[in-house]
Amino acid sequence: MVKQIRKLTIKKAKWKASDGIVYIYATLNNTIITIVDTSGRVVSWSSAGICGFRGARKASPFAAKTAAEYAARQCINKGINRAQVLVKGLGTGRHTSIRGLQDAGLKISLIRDITTTPHNGCRQPKRRRV
């Protein structure tokens, strides 16, 4: 008779942190939201493209709010209730994504803008004439 070999299963550690950091990267074409715990491990992430928006609709504020609510619901299920928000970029989904996080039930303790500004760095692209 052949003995059956047991499969070893590794249990993942549950999230112990109740605080997190939300990074919102709002570009002109998309909005990407990443939620990490205090040690820097990614808990959940979302973008307007993942929520089903394509093309120009990804750049809309409604798409940013939907993506923020999706990411916030995932991290609330894992036990993160409070978060600091770090916003980067000049896209249209900056403010509505913060509102989406609050609507999903995430308590926001701090909002900080970390958009980088050039000190006359690279040359800007040629302006479009329509």
Swiss-Prot record:
The gene is rps11. GO terms for biological process: translation. This is Small ribosomal subunit protein uS11c. It is found in: Plastid, Chloroplast. Belongs to the universal ribosomal protein uS11 family. It holds the Pfam family Ribosomal_S11. SUPFAM superfamilies: Translational machinery components (SSF53137). GO terms for molecular function: rRNA binding; structural constituent of ribosome. The keyword RNA-binding applies. The lineage of its organism: Eukaryota, Sar, Rhizaria, Cercozoa, Chlorarachniophyceae. Keywords: Chloroplast, Plastid, Ribonucleoprotein, Ribosomal protein, RNA-binding, rRNA-binding.
